[in-house]
């Protein structure tokens, strides 16, 4: 992958298409050509939002996106820009599509994986140009703000959802300008273990992965070519590189992954790291409002060079009747909720989670609670609100 990312791109260029001045800042639109991949020139819509007050001129936020509603994207960028006092941007059309008989999204990614396995041509995997488009977008943002505002950006916070979240992880593995990441609804780290675990929990792979399973990409995971591919496209292969701050934005009912997919990589991820689970949310995070507010707080901390909240917890099983949970934080705890549901197995895709506020000493950096153990099955997680 790194050979592809580092390859010179003669087709790289950008040009302004429209600038809108608003009371709160400016919205600038650009046409970006990131590369030529297998004869196809990749063209993107790049939007850069600049708030009136720039208190953090050295950092920018970049969202990797597909073909979503640009108005909603800009509204989110405005919130993030005003909260962080920094430039924010969205890169659209990742990946460029459709290609190869109308394939899009996972069907296109899976097809390119299969073509690599058939031909051995290392330029095939679609995640390579997806990651490179983000790298070239960062180049363009640096060039644009330096040319137009005499501003030097050295740090990036990168965010993307699903396949774009996958590209977020991989971009952070290869580009040192990325000093924090916030991947959303992507539980693909440690692919081999995830596939094995999904088969155990569901009895088969999730139907959401059918584009991959129909090509039998979940089989022969020990095959030499498959191992080579996995070493390129599995973020877990680069896990030691993820030393930057990380916020994982997930949904409790995401049907792509098991509810405990974190078990296969969380403990191996270097600090600092945080998780936010949107309750009763699938792959779309129920519209993403809770995730956006959490992301805004995360971005503000990173932009202002402030440390992330650090949370540690211990569990004690008491006579197999309940679990005592002890929580320590470097920030005062404003509230703590117990979100729970029950399942006889680990398939939580259709479960309804309910919340119970727990009594704590407000503004203490310590909290403890007791969770009754179910007679059978599985349940529960905790959510903290920090001041």
Segments from the language model and where they lie:
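Cap/lid segment of the alpha/beta-hydrolase catalytic domain
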Residues: 88-132, 193-201
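Hydrolase active-site cap/lid region
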Residues: 170-219, 277-280, 285-289
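Short beta-strand/loop motif that positions the catalytic acidic residue
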Residues: 242, 248-250
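Histidine-bearing beta->alpha loop at or near hydrolase active sites
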Residues: 263, 271-295, 358
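Surface beta-strand/loop "capping" patches
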Residues: 298-340, 357-370
């Amino acid at each position: 992958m790194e050979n592809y990312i580092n390859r010179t791109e003669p087709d790289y260029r950008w040009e302004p298409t429209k600038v809108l001045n608003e009371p709160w800042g400016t919205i600038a639109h650009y046409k970006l050509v990131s590369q030529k991949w297998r004869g196809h020139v990749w063209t993107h819509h790049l939007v850069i939002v600049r708030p009136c007050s720039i208190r953090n001129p050295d950092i920018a936020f970049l969202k990797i996106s597909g073909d979503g509603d640009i108005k909603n994207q800009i509204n989110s960028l405005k919130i993030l820009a005003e909260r962080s006092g920094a430039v924010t941007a969205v890169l659209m059309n990742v990946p460029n599509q459709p290609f190869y008989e109308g394939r899009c999204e996972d069907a296109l990614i899976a097809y390119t994986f299969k073509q690599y396995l058939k031909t051995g041509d290392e330029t095939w995997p679609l995640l390579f140009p997806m990651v490179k488009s983000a790298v070239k977008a960062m180049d363009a943002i640096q060039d644009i703000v330096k040319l137009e505002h005499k501003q030097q950006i050295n740090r990036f916070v990168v965010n993307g959802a699903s396949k774009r979240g996958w590209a977020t992880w991989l971009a952070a593995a290869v580009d040192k300008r990325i000093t924090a990441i916030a991947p959303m609804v992507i539980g693909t780290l440690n692919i081999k273990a995830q596939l094995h675990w999904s088969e155990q929990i569901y009895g088969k792979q999730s139907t959401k992965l059918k584009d991959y399973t129909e090509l039998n990409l979940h089989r022969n995971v020990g095959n030499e070519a498959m191992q080579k591919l996995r070493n390129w496209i599995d973020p877990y292969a680069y896990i030691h590189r993820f030393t930057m701050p990380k916020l994982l934005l997930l949904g409790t009912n995401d049907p792509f992954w098991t509810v405990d997919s974190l078990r296969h990589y969380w403990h191996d991820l270097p600090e600092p790291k945080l998780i936010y689970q949107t309750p009763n949310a699938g792959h779309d995070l129920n519209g993403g409002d809770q995730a956006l507010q959490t992301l805004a707080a995360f971005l503000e901390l990173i932009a202002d060079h402030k440390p992330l909240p650090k949370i540690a917890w211990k569990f004690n099983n008491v006579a197999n009747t309940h679990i005592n949970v002890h929580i320590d934080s470097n920030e005062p705890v404003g509230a703590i909720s117990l979100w729970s549901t029950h399942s006889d197995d680990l398939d939580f895709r259709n479960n309804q989670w309910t919340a119970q506020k727990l009594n704590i000493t407000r503004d203490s950096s310590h909290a403890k609670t007791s969770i009754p153990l179910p007679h059978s099955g599985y349940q529960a997680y905790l959510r903290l609100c920090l001041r």
